[in-house]
Amino acid sequence: MYQDLIRSELNEAAEVLNKFLSDDHNIAQIEAAAKMIADSFKQDGKVLSCGNGGSHCDAMHFAEELTGRYRDNRPGYAGIAISDPSHLSCVSNDFGYDFVFSRYVEAVGRKGDVLFGLSTSGNSGNILKAIEAAKAKGMKTVALTGKDGGKMAGLADVEIRVPHFGYADRIQEVHIKIIHIIIQLIEKEME
């Protein structure tokens, strides 16, 4: 009954991934992000990750696989998703939602750390403010974006952009693949 819809959805997902994969710049950016993060870990730095909605879940997934594990056992890496409900609700109430991530970066971020921000539109105000705060602290920044990069285009030290202009879930599907590859590369760099 729904087999054509299922095939159509899977084919569209494959097309978005293949378009991303066909641009060598994307591959180089993934490698650059992994090396940047591994270099931070080698200097006792950490990664702070953030996103909204499904991208927030991806930010938590990224941090969890850094502190826990990806495929194989190894020492944990310092990854923190900015996801504490009391922090998010306090800052949202007292300062506004645009400041939920930047306030955390200001409090916890240090020179040599990395901010890992996800925004499928590239226009999330709270991620933009987090990038600004990270740069002010001397941190490196990685942004996973979509579409044309939005307001984040060119702001991060490394931007990995999925150039899809349809629904955000297609961008998120590629983002999670990027996250897994970055973790795999970090593990190789840390051996």
UniProtKB/Swiss-Prot annotation:
Major subcellular location class: cytoplasm
Domain SIS span(s) in chain numbering: 37-191
Biological process (GO), any one: lipopolysaccharide core region biosynthetic process
Enzyme class: isomerase
Stated role: Catalyzes the isomerization of sedoheptulose 7-phosphate in D-glycero-D-manno-heptose 7-phosphate.
Subunit and partners: Homotetramer.
Protein name (Swiss-Prot/TrEMBL): Phosphoheptose isomerase
Organism: Vibrio parahaemolyticus serotype O3:K6 (strain RIMD 2210633)
Phylogenetic lineage: Bacteria, Pseudomonadati, Pseudomonadota, Gammaproteobacteria, Vibrionales
